Amino acid sequence: MNYQRKTLKNGLKLVFVPMNNDIPLVAMGFYVGVGSRNEFGAYKNGISHFLEHMMFKRTTNKSSDELFSELDSTGANYNAITTTQNTCYFLSGNSNYIDKLLDIMLDIFLHPNFVSDDIERERKVIMEEMKIRADQPQSSMTYQIHEVYFKNTSLSQKVIGSIESIKNIDKNDLEKFYSTFYRPNNTIFIMAGNFDVFSVYDKIKSNLEKLTNNNFCTTSYLHEGPIIINNMKKQTKPKIYLNDCLSNKQSIVMITFPIYDLYNTYGMEIDVLSKILSGGFSSRLAKILREKTGLTYSQNSYPMVYMGAAIFVVQVSFGTNDILRGIKLVIQEIDKLKKNGPNGISDTEMIKSINMIKNGILHNFLDPINVISYFGSNNINNRNYQFDLNHQFDNLDHLSKEDVYQITKTILKYKKMNIFICGKTNGDIGDHILEQLYFD
């Protein structure tokens, strides 16, 4: 893959990924190293996300109607995402309109115009978005998981903010936040798809190299790592957290374990473990929970990864009367992995899991939007990131059963386990579940 990276004199990184195909599609976007974690203790919670909304409202050159009309006239797709650590703005469209799309993308990022009337209207929009998220059980459970594992740190607060904090964000807050964090040495511009680098480079360079880095001291959350790890180490017995979701026809169960700060070193092993448990219908959880017992339609396991800490999650949905039985079966499969040693993992499971991970990586390179997401997130989270697919695949191929077994023993400890349940539950089901489960 033709992957090119350049750094302007002001520190802004440019990433270009021309894709050799006949499909006239191009995607482009900005990644900024700021999210809700940067707000903690210094800025109003939710301002990163609020600013993301406002960037699409209008520029000093165009009203929102003009912006959206021009984008829609090309048939472009456009959106933005705020996470705990990053904010991304992107659009994709027919590469025949690349000049127009690039002009709009640069205008949105470089010339935002925060008008008071727009701010008040968008405040209401965000309040409605809050209601939508509150009605989604998985979102509510994820917030609760963060509150439990990341107490008194930046990861304990919501990306969208609270009702009170959103009510109090004003124009001055937005302008200060933009000038503080939207600076070149904290930003990456990325373009992927059917385009020629030489035809767009001069325009991009001339617009972005004008940006200067301010002298503001931005907030950092890197010091939180030891605090989070210490909180995780304090837990000495499993706990259950119940949430009554009376409108749900199923109960969502999330069985979680702390990964501490191990993902950065053992990420591949943890990803293989995840695939052994839930990768495809031949996985251990799919076999027992769906194919053999019919207890669930879907099951999944995955790591929630942040800078300095991570959590391993097993997520399953059960009928209310099957919660206890379902959790028991999940624990039984974890027991087998822990107690049967490296040889308890079959060659077939290792090969399948590694191939699934490789396939997932390769699928990132089919669609230009996925390409900018892959390279954007990797570059913004690791300023020294180097793309080497062969090296990545070679490392996967050299993983052993012993490697996966050792990380399994390390992170899947029942005394550190927290189970979150959202559904139609009675008050004593939590104690009943813990009484019924056997833990070593």
UniProtKB/Swiss-Prot annotation:
Q: Which family does it belong to?
A: Belongs to the peptidase M16 family.
Question: Tell me, what is an example of a GO biological process annotation in this record?
Answer: proteolysis
The residues listed in the UniProt record as binding Zn(2+), with positions renumbered to this chain, are 49, 53, 129
Disulfide linkages recorded for this protein, renumbered to the chain, are none
Please give the superkingdom of this protein's source. Viruses
Q: Which InterPro entries match?
A: Metalloenz_LuxS/M16, MPP/UQCRC_Complex, Pept_M16_N, Peptidase_M16_C
Instruction: Give the enzyme's main class according to its UniProt record, as a single word.
Output: hydrolase
Q: Identify the keywords attached in UniProt to this record, alphabetized.
A: Hydrolase, Metal-binding, Metalloprotease, Protease, Zinc
UniProt cross-references to SUPFAM superfamilies, sorted A to Z: LuxS/MPP-like metallohydrolase
Q: Which organism is it from?
A: Acanthamoeba polyphaga mimivirus (APMV)
Q: What protein name applies here?
A: Putative zinc protease L233
